Amino acid sequence: MARSAAIERITKETQIKLSLEIDGKGEAQICTSVPFLDHMLDLFARHGLFDLKVEAHGDIDIDFHHTVEDIGIVLGAAFKEALGDKCGIRRYGNAVVPMDEVLASVATDLSGRPYLVYNVQLPKVKIGDFDVELVREFFQGFVNHCGANLHLNLMYGDNVHHIVEACFKAAARALDQATQLDARIEGVMSTKGKL
């Protein structure tokens, strides 16, 4: 059975079409009108080995906030839908990723209980036209609609582009680990019997 989802979300602020294949090859087709986010989603797909297609249009003439946050929302919802009842998944995942002078870590639990711990101190700057404070908004939208507990930690580093890139790569690798099927797991990885 394919673990995939296709979601379309239309609001007065954004129009987003997204498809996700969890058991993919890391292929991506991304067009969000936010070039830096395109880059982050492309490497997210590649390092998580997810096949991901995103087409988004938003009120970027105002700023990128709604578009970035809403893509996080839709991506989280796609993971939730694709995982279904979560039978057989490992549930937990973690990754520590270096990017030159940066080291970032992510630990995740696909528990159904959304919670974001975001220990990433970034200066209030832009990478191109992209406000780096939107990285948190993206991940908050993601966890809220995926039902994931995500701990994102910057251990050290200076270059803001490298920091954000390491965070997205670590998140992808942790989610790849957590979504893996394990033949030894009967039902769900919980003593409650439900996630």
Curated annotation (Swiss-Prot):
InterPro entries: IGPD_sf, ImidazoleglycerolP_deHydtase, ImidazoleglycerP_deHydtase_CS, Ribosomal_Su5_D2-typ_SF
Localisation per UniProt entry: Cytoplasm
UniProt GO cellular component terms: cytoplasm
Known catalytic reactions: D-erythro-1-(imidazol-4-yl)glycerol 3-phosphate = 3-(imidazol-4-yl)-2-oxopropyl phosphate + H2O
Xref: PROSITE patterns: IGP_DEHYDRATASE_1 (PS00954), IGP_DEHYDRATASE_2 (PS00955)
Keywords per UniProt: Amino-acid biosynthesis, Cytoplasm, Histidine biosynthesis, Lyase
Enzyme class: lyase
Disulphide-bridged cysteine pairs: none
This enzyme's EC code(s): 4.2.1.19
GO biological process: L-histidine biosynthetic process
A Pfam match: IGPD
A GO molecular-function descriptor: imidazoleglycerol-phosphate dehydratase activity
Primary site of residence: cytoplasm
Pathway annotation: Amino-acid biosynthesis; L-histidine biosynthesis; L-histidine from 5-phospho-alpha-D-ribose 1-diphosphate: step 6/9
Stored NCBIfam families: PRK00951.2-1, PRK00951.2-4, PRK00951.2-5
Annotated family: Belongs to the imidazoleglycerol-phosphate dehydratase family.
PANTHER family with a match to the protein in the record: IMIDAZOLEGLYCEROL-PHOSPHATE DEHYDRATASE, IMIDAZOLEGLYCEROL-PHOSPHATE DEHYDRATASE HIS7
UniProt name for this protein: Imidazoleglycerol-phosphate dehydratase
The organism of origin for this protein: Geobacter sp. (strain M21)
